[in-house]
Curated annotation (Swiss-Prot):
Pfam families: Ribosomal_L6. One of its GO terms (molecular function) is structural constituent of ribosome. One of its GO terms (cellular component) is cytosolic large ribosomal subunit. It comes from Rhodococcus jostii (strain RHA1). This is Large ribosomal subunit protein uL6.
């Protein structure tokens, strides 16, 4: 039995979970999210208000999807109650970010500003010209947008310049030494 998959998912008050076959829809104070569970995995509501994720057999695919499915359902519930936020920072002379309406505009040492549009369900907040955050209810979307922004100018291992997650440690390399 999967150590993660066998733990029941608690549903807090104010969250409505509806299950229709393999489709799970979660509605909460911050919005609504839907997920389709892969075929061998079954999900059911318990009498005590929790959700249980079960697998029919011990095949390799079923074991692999058991814990994953439970975690994805838990992420939906956490997203509609608390939401997800990724804080990021920019290091480098002249590197900065500005909020233009709902979108972000980066100055990252290129000959042009780099705009990033806010997709549906994602909000940006700029705390200072070098610190900003990406927020939303979908954990996967928040993480993907954050990774795309970081990819605009990855942190340099020699000087540490670039876009990074808050608190991220960059492995620094020693430069060449002259003779």
């Amino acid at each position: 039995m999967s150590r993660i998959g066998k733990i029941p998912v608690t549903v807090p008050g104010g969250v409505d979970v509806s299950i229709d076959g393999q489709d799970v829809t979660v509605k909460g104070p911050k919005g609504s999210l839907a997920l389709t569970i892969s075929e061998p995995i079954a999900i059911a509501k318990n009498d005590d208000g929790t959700l249980s994720v079960t697998r029919p057999d011990d095949e390799r695919r079923s074991r692999a999807l058991h814990g994953l499915s439970r975690t994805l359902v838990q992420n939906l519930i956490t997203g509609v109650t608390d939401g997800y936020t990724t804080k990021m920072e920019i290091h480098g002379v002249g590197y900065r970010v500005a909020l233009k309406g709902k979108d972000l505009e980066f100055a990252l040492g290129y000959s042009h500003p780099v705009p990033i549009e806010a997709p549906e369900g994602i909000t940006f907040a700029v705390e200072s010209p070098t610190k900003f955050s990406v927020s939303g209810i979908d954990k996967q979307k928040v993480g993907q947008i954050s990774a795309n922004i970081r990819r605009l100018r990855r942190p340099d291992p020699y000087k540490g310049k670039g876009v990074r997650y808050e608190g991220e440690q960059i492995r620094r390399k020693v430069g060449k030494t002259g003779k």
